UniProtKB/Swiss-Prot annotation:
It comes from Rhodobacter capsulatus. Heme c binds at C55, C58, H59, M205. The chain crosses the membrane at residues 249-267. The gene is petC. The main subunits of complex b-c1 are: cytochrome b, cytochrome c1 and the Rieske protein. This is Cytochrome c1. One of its GO terms (cellular component) is plasma membrane.
Length: 280
């Protein structure tokens, strides 16, 4: 018992330290969070627009089939539009013929490789930790999941207009981001022990979002904050397209198990209670 208690405390402490790596990521309420949460179709469509017009230049989604854009629970775009959209993307080498052809809706989104290209965004929402809970305890991840959408949202909106006071000139060719933890930091922004004194660090990626960068088809004002929320939601759907269906299945399973437990209890009372009283 003592060893178990020590192990549990150690895990909590170590987990807290890891969670503190992204302690500057603040909580944000998305529509798909919680047991009954669902994706907002309008938001997914706006997020897809931001991805296709802004992010897709440098970031691919090589694990996401294009056809899923018309699936239930997602953006549910018109299949004809999806086919035309696929045909307008980068061409692909056919696996059977070895010849170059137009991309089809059954193919994956293009990938982006080479100098200046960013990481693939297919599962980015599951690969980054967001809000860690009180004091970086990691409780938020335990009860609400890893929080990747929060990280994405805070990252794309986390480029301040001015650099921190400790390095007003910044780093040439890099851009300060308030939640990015693994980038470069000037010596002027470190204490005597060499630990950085800023919340974030400098990243190679420049700010990608600006007010009115896109024109939303539904008329929603395209502020940086709005575009950040929308693209984060879209990337969460891209990483977890069956999230809502899985929640519903889990809820049904819990209800069925609850009913089964009640039935077993009542059956036990009905069949065995008289014999237990006789034995007593």
């Amino acid at each position: 018992m003592k060893k178990l208690l020590i192990s549990a405390v150690s895990a909590l402490v170590l987990g807290s330290g890891a969670a503190l790596a992204n302690s500057n990521v603040q909580d944000h309420a998305f529509s798909f969070e919680g047991i009954f949460g669902k994706f907002d179709q309008a938001q997914l469509r706006r997020g897809f627009q931001v991805y296709s017009e802004v992010c897709s230049t440098c970031h691919g989604m090589k694990f996401v089939p294009i056809r899923t854009l018309s699936d239930d629970g997602g953006p549910q775009l018109d299949p004809t539009f999806v086919r035309e959209y696929a045909a307008g993307l980068d061409t692909i080498i056919d696996k059977d013929s070895g010849e170059e052809r137009d991309r089809k809706e059954t193919d994956m989104f293009p990938t982006r490789v080479g100098d200046g290209m960013g990481p693939d965004l297919s599962v980015m929402a599951k690969a980054r930790a967001g809000f860690s809970g009180p004091a970086g305890s990691g409780m938020n991840q335990l009860f609400k999941g890893i929080g990747g959408p929060e990280y994405i949202y805070r990252y794309v909106t986390g480029f301040p207009e001015e650099n921190p006071a400790c390095a007003p000139e910044g780093i040439d060719g890099y851009y300060y981001n308030e939640v990015f933890q693994v980038g470069g930091v000037p010596d002027t922004c470190k204490d005597a022990a060499g630990i950085k004194t800023t919340h974030g660090s400098w990243a190679q990626m420049p700010p990608a979002l600006f007010d009115d960068l896109v024109t939303y088809e539904d008329g929603t004002p395209a502020t940086v904050d709005q575009m950040g929320q929308d693209v984060a939601s879209f990337l969460m759907w891209a990483a977890e397209p069956k999230l809502v269906a899985r929640k519903q299945m889990g809820l049904v399973a819990v209800v069925m198990l609850g009913l089964l437990s009640v039935m077993l209890y009542l059956t036990n009372k009905r069949l065995w209670a008289p014999y237990k009283r006789q034995k007593a």
